[in-house]
């Protein structure tokens, strides 16, 4: 699946579209796991996928789970094999790739069959030997400089398998003279998933007041439960809405987007009493209206607040995964939400992967592509997920220069025209019937 600045995944219920986001969360969860021996951390805070048999297609334990990830680094990475200036540089470049395969039919549980890192025109692979599940070979291929791993003198000890399906074992570094750079590959992989942030579709109810310990959260929480904490932690920071525009306080940026969505006239978070550490989120829905708490207005405001906050709070260049960001919003606000996504993607360089059911959000996104000044079709990837015979199928939607979808799937966003035609047919039938009586 090719991802753009904004990647939208649409589809029917239970078609498998959420699985795409879940797998990225699974890899992040595995990276953060404390058990170095685990291949995939299938159950944790981010996702709960059960056992390997639950996660594999049709529960077929003879199948393997394999994946391939490729992304462009912001800065070129140059690997160094050793401190000697005469040593061959293993690889360099901006194009970074990673592949792995995990099988679940081992007696000891899921095991990683291989991991492979790629940088530029070089590849470094740790792969299970054919004779023994616990012994692995470390090898390299390069079309540039012919780099190869050099063993230390002495007995050739076997190399154990990967750690957490992405990291090389310590022996891969100690058994070779020129393999210290493997840590740089692992660190690049870890940095990628450290920069992945997630907001789920089920968000917390708003509260009448919030206790803030004056700490800085990593994000807004998977249910948006730390959105107010994030706003308070960033309140002394500034952001701007576009290149060359005036910087505004972080809280003002949040208020701006809530107003653009047509949900409020003003928004602020203030302490109940000095040094109380208890804060209240207050809004004014219309100019001249009374100021009320977040709990006393429409539910949609509290549900979209974490979306806006997360997109403005995460570091520039982050990857944000969103499930149904439009939930509980009326159609006009759903349309305007597309502008929130576009600003974060194009101005803050946040890569957004979202799962949505909103035709209104999609229509605004298409409109902005047609206008061409805020986002182009080259920056957007759209996919449709369906499971006509119980097996998920992902179709890439063809978008032209003006945002028009060339291969619009049947019943992509329901059958609005069919409903109108059926209603008109029923209306005529009843009118004829009433006249004949």
Protein language model features and the residues they cover:
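Pre-Walker A-like glycine/lysine-rich segment at the N-terminus of P-loop NTPase domains
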Residues: 1-52
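Phosphate-binding P-loop
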Residues: 1-4, 285-286, 311-316, 343-347
């Amino acid at each position: 699946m090719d991802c753009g600045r904004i990647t939208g995944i649409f589809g029917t219920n239970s078609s498998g579209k959420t699985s795409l986001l879940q797998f990225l969360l699974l890899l992040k969860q595995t990276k953060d796991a404390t058990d170095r021996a685990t291949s995939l951390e299938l159950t944790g805070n981010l996702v709960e996928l059960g056992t390997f048999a639950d996660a594999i297609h049709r529960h077929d334990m003879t199948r393997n789970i394999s994946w391939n990830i490729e992304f462009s680094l912001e800065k070129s990475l140059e690997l160094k094999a050793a401190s000697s200036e005469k040593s061959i540089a293993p690889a360099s470049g901006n194009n970074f790739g990673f592949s792995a395969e995990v099988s679940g039919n081992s007696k000891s549980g899921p095991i990683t069959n291989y991991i492979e890192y790629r940088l530029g025109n070089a590849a470094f692979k740790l792969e299970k030997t054919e004779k023994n599940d616990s012994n692995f070979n470390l090898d390299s291929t390069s079309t540039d400089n012919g780099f190869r791993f050099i063993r230390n003198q002495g007995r050739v000890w076997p190399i154990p398998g990967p750690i957490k399906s992405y990291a090389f074992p310590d022996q891969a570094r100690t058994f070779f003279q020129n393999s210290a750079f493997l840590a740089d590959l692992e660190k690049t992989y870890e940095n990628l998933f450290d920069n992945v942030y997630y907001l789920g579709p089920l968000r917390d109810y708003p509260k009448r007041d919030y206790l803030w310990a004056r700490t800085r959260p990593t994000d807004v929480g998977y249910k948006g439960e730390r959105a107010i904490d994030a706003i308070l932690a960033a309140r002394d920071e500034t952001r701007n809405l576009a290149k060359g525009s005036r910087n505004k306080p972080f809280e003002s940026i949040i208020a701006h987007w809530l107003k653009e969505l047509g949900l409020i006239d003003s928004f602020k978070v203030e302490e109940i009493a000095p040094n109380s550490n208890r804060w209240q989120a207050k809004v004014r829905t219309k100019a001249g209206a009374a100021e009320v708490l977040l709990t006393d207005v429409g539910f949609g405001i509290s549900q979209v607040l974490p979306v806006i906050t997360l997109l403005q709070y995460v570091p520039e260049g982050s990857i944000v995964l969103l499930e149904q960001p439009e939930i509980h919003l009326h159609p006009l606000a759903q349309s305007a939400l597309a502008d929130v996504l576009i600003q974060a993607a194009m101005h803050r360089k946040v890569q957004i992967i979202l799962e949505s059911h909103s035709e209104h959000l999609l229509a605004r996104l298409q409109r902005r592509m047609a206008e061409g000044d805020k986002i182009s079709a080259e920056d957007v990837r759209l996919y449709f997920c369906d499971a006509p015979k119980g097996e998920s199928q992902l179709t890439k939607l063809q978008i032209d220069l003006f945002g028009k979808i060339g291969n619009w799937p049947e019943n992509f966003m329901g059958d609005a025209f069919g409903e109108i035609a059926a209603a008109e047919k029923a209306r005529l039938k009843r009118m004829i019937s009433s006249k004949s009586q």
